[in-house]
């Protein structure tokens, strides 16, 4: 007799991840075996699991390439406006499963792999994360690429193909240790090298001014070799391109006079040129003016703009008169979005191309340049803003410095004309800062050189307008906009939480995957006890799966019915992992004080990387791991409280932990987190949020109702008032006995008995240099956590609140964000045309998604 189907299997029969056709499965198996034999040159006797992963990846890629080519043909034929998303980071994660979902192949692939006697999950786990980003900024770029393809926009992501991505984090004896992320060592089946589009990038040299114009001469040349990765939209046959540049030394690099020099040394020196794309810089929100980093920023910009102009000239809009290309139509055909200030050199570089090479008059070139560029600001922390030393720019990019000076002069002339007596305003608004050595303020360059500037959440955009760039918004108020960040529901629901995705589809249909606002329909089920129980059941399945993963990876046995309290993001003082840690110790002390008292069991999971040079962040990790050591080994605590530090947090680990989370920690000091996107991922996956009124938390509370989040602590105005009054940490320490006990324990070596003064730097910072005011929010945070525990005991009330949050999360789709960018900044129209494959029609496009 057949076994009864599990809930998961029943749901898969009506899954939104594609219908399994017998032909599909047979074709996939055939493709798999073909690649195993002809691409990998293996048979089943000698093939390894990695070979099977590669065979599957190539098979899936076969289904991409036709769509990829048709998409590019369609863009060439129709000449739509194109948007270029310039970012030094693209935190893509893994590609295989996301591609299967977006092509509607997942169930067919699952079935084919099952019939081949292999384990799909095992194959998916073999793929390396493409960790070409630090955190939110790079992951946002990845979500945006998915949305741009899904919305049918002619979009390109441009960045650097780092040989080493964000470091792998190991925890040894409680300390973070960094290891290189050699993510390409086994090869990457998703990329295609395009040596035919290799381009020269110039550095150093000098500037010659002649009668005929200005020339940048005697430069060192590095070649930029593009690698293309396909970016499939969801079920629309659109496949866009992410083009990442790799640095190569030219053949004659340092060899011009090797006869009199050292040929071997000259060849070895080629590494110097190729170092440009060697490694991603870890971000600690603290700007350091490193020459190699500036080279990276110019490298991506120079290669990309040559590519953009080549593509424009090849289109019907790149018309020529007797003098050369006419660029009047350029801003109507090209939009370039700068993801933070890292690609800001694109502004003087485009001016250099227009003025020096294409011989446009300055005023004309400037008008076109401004209309082309837009800038997204991602941080309000002043120490994080890029300010490059003038002498470094002068050495590396002498012509660009001249252009920046010229831009600044014209900008300041305008300020003087408008505010003739306001010298301090002129100094504040200059692109060149004079204090402590001349520096170029890259954010000011972006604001002056772009037609639109946006923040990434309402509260952040307000701070940008009224505080950080107040002078500029007074000058051009219409330039400043808000575009609240979003996340792609394909990866952050369908891929990572298929149980919940299918459950939602049962109730409201499948269209929500491309229109997340439809989740509001779930509001009508908040009183449906059966549905609430099903949602709770999916959460429990995810928790069970994750607890098995934790036991396997960390050898810690946890209680899967405990509350999973999760805090995963970069380790930084402003994100306040320390506040969470103080609460953990407080809970520990309460259990020890009264072991018989009922305590709502919790598993506190903290994860994230500290930048290698950021001492305080590394100390915070050591404190968390030391506290975990004590708590997890105390028999009196047992399964009531467990603390896990998640090693090497990355996209593929986020996909596991987020669906299993009950409580999401979003506790930055109000006014410091620009937006956050982790908060949105947790909300969509049925976790409740404990957080401050900061970043996108504010809008999450607006959407779901503040009563459906656990909001605590100071608001932005309270923080400002406390700054004005003067923050005295000691006052809180003296007034709050539980806080005093916790701090004394850390200070006297309770968590580091072999090194009692191990955490003196943390204690010293908390008392005397804490810009993020941990003590000021401690009491409110602990009280709010008590409310969380209380509600968790009432599972029906908890699950009702969960459903209200899921139903309110539709705003936070990156599809909505990208539609706003397209309408308000890029002047582009999303398209719901489904590009037909060549055998479907002659004109290459079918309407109505057919």
Swiss-Prot record:
Regulation (activators, inhibitors): Allosterically regulated through the non-covalent binding of metabolites, being activated by AMP and inhibited by ATP, ADP, and glucose-6-phosphate. The activity is also controlled by post-translational modifications including phosphorylation and acetylation.
Subcellular location(s) per record: Cytoplasm, Cytosol
GO molecular function, one term: identical protein binding
SUPFAM superfamilies on file: UDP-Glycosyltransferase/glycogen phosphorylase (SSF53756)
Record-listed N6-succinyllysine modification sites: 364
Transmembrane segments: none
Modified residues (N6-(pyridoxal phosphate)lysine): 681
InterPro entries xrefs: Glycg_phsphrylas, Glyco_trans_35, Pyridoxal_P_attach_site
Assigned keywords, A-Z: Acetylation, Allosteric enzyme, Carbohydrate metabolism, Cytoplasm, Glycogen metabolism, Glycosyltransferase, Nucleotide-binding, Phosphoprotein, Pyridoxal phosphate, Transferase
Signal peptide: none
Coiled coil location: none
Annotated site residue numbers, May be involved in allosteric control: 156
A GO cellular-component term linked to this record: cytosol
Record-annotated site: Involved in the association of subunits: 109, 143
Cofactor: pyridoxal 5'-phosphate
Residue positions where Phosphoserine is found in the record: 15, 524, 527, 561, 639
GO biological process: glucose homeostasis; glycogen catabolic process; glycogen metabolic process; necroptotic process; response to bacterium
Annotated AMP binding sites: 43-45, 76, 310
Enzyme class name: transferase
UniProt EC number: 2.4.1.1
Pfam families found in the cross-reference section: Phosphorylase
N-acetylalanine modification, residue list: 2
Job of this protein: Allosteric enzyme that catalyzes the rate-limiting step in glycogen catabolism, the phosphorolytic cleavage of glycogen to produce glucose-1-phosphate, and plays a central role in maintaining cellular and organismal glucose homeostasis.
NCBIfam families xref list: P_ylase (TIGR02093)
Family assignment from sequence similarity: Belongs to the glycogen phosphorylase family.
Name the record gives this protein: Glycogen phosphorylase, liver form
Species in which this protein is naturally found: Mus musculus (Mouse)
Gene: Pygl
């Amino acid at each position: 007799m057949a076994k009864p189907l599990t809930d998961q299997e029943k749901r898969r029969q009506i899954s939104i991840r594609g219908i399994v056709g017998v032909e599909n499965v047979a074709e996939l198996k055939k493709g798999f075996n073909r690649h195993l034999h002809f691409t990998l040159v293996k048979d089943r006797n000698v093939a390894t699991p990695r070979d099977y992963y590669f065979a599957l990846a190539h098979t899936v890629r076969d289904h991409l390439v036709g769509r990829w080519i048709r998409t590019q043909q369609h863009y060439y034929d129709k000449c739509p406006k194109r948007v270029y998303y310039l970012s030094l980071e693209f935190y893509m994660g893994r590609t295989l499963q996301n591609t299967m979902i977006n092509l509607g192949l997942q169930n067919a692939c699952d079935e084919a792999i099952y019939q081949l006697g292999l384990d799909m999950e095992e194959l998916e786990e073999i793929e390396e994360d493409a960790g070409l980003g630090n955190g939110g900024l790079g992951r946002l770029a990845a979500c945006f690429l998915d949305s741009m393809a899904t919305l049918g926009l002619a979009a390109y992501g441009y960045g650097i193909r780092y040989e080493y991505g964000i470091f792998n984090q190991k925890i040894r004896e409680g300390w973070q240790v960094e290891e290189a992320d050699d993510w390409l060592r086994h090869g990457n089946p998703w990329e295609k090298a395009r040596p035919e589009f290799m381009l020269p990038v110039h550095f150093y040299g000098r500037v010659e001014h002649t009668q005929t114009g200005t020339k940048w001469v005697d430069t060192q040349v590095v070649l930029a070799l593009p690698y293309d990765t396909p970016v499939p939209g969801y079920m629309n046959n659109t496949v866009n391109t992410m083009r990442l540049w790799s640095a190569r030394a030219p053949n004659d690099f340092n060899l011009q006079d090797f006869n009199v020099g050292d040929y071997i040394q000259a060849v070895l020196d080629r590494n110097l040129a190729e170092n440009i794309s060697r490694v991603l810089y870890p971000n600690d929100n603290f700007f350091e003016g490193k020459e190699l980093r500036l080279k990276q920023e110019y490298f991506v910009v120079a290669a990309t703009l040559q590519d953009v102009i080549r593509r424009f000239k090849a289109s019907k809009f790149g018309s020529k008169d007797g003098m050369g290309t006419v660029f009047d139509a350029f801003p109507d055909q090209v939009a370039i979005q700068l993801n933070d200030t890292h690609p800001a050199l694109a502004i003087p570089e485009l001016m250099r191309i227009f003025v020096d090479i294409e011989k446009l008059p300055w005023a004309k070139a400037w008008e076109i340049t401004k209309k082309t560029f837009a800038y997204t600001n991602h941080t309000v922390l002043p120490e994080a803003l890029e300010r490059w030393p003038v002498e470094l720019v002068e050495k590396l990019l002498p012509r660009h410095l001249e252009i920046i000076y010229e831009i600044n002069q014209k900008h300041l002339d305008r300020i003087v004309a408008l505010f003739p007596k306001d010298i301090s305003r002129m100094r504040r608004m200059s692109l060149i800062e004079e204090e402590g050595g001349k520096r170029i303020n890259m954010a000011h360059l972006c604001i002056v050189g772009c037609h639109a500037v946006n923040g990434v959440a309402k509260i952040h955009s307000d701070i940008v307008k009224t505080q950080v760039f107040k002078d500029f918004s007074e000058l051009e108020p219409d330039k400043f906009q808000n575009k609240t960040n979003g996340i792609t529901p394909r990866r952050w629901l369908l891929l990572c939480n298929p149980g919940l995705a299918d459950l939602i589809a049962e109730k409201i249909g499948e269209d929500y995957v491309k229109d997340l606002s439809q989740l509001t329909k779930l509001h009508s089920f908040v009183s449906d006890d059966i549905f609430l129980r099903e949602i709770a059941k999916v959460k429990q399945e995810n928790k069970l799966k994750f607890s098995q993963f934790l036991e396997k990876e960390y050898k810690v046995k946890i209680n899967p019915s405990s509350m999973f309290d999760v805090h995963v993001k970069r380790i930084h003082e402003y994100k306040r992992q320390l506040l969470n840690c103080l609460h953990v110790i407080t809970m520990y002390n309460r259990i020890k004080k009264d072991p018989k008292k009922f305590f709502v069991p919790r598993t506190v999971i903290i994860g994230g990387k500290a930048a290698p040079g950021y001492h305080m962040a590394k100390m915070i990790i050591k404190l968390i791991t030391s506290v975990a050591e004590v708590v997890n080994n105390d028999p009196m605590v047992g399964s009531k409280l467990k603390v896990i530090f998640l090693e090497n947090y990355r996209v593929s680990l986020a996909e596991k932990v987020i669906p299993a989370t009950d409580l999401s920690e979003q506790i930055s000091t109000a006014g410091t987190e620009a937006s956050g996107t982790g908060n949105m991922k947790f909300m969509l996956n049925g976790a409740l949020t404990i957080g401050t009124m900061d970043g996108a938390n504010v809008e999450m509370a607006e959407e779901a109702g503040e009563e459906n989040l656990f909001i605590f602590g100071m608001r932005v105005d309270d923080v400002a008032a406390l700054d004005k009054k003067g923050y005295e940490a000691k006052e809180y320490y003296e007034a709050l006995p539980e806080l005093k006990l916790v701090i004394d324990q850390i200070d006297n070596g309770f968590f580091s008995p072999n090194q009692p003064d191990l955490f003196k730097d943390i204690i010293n910072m908390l008392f005397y240099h804490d810009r993020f005011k941990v003590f000021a929010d401690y009491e409110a945070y602990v009280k709010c956590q008590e409310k969380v525990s209380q509600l968790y005991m009432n599972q029906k009330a908890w699950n009702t609140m969960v459903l209200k949050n899921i139903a309110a999360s539709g705003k936070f789709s990156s599809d909505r964000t990208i539609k706003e960018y397209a309408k308000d900044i890029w002047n582009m129209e999303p398209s719901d045309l489904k590009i037909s494959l060549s055998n479907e029609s002659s004109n290459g496009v079918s309407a109505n998604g057919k």
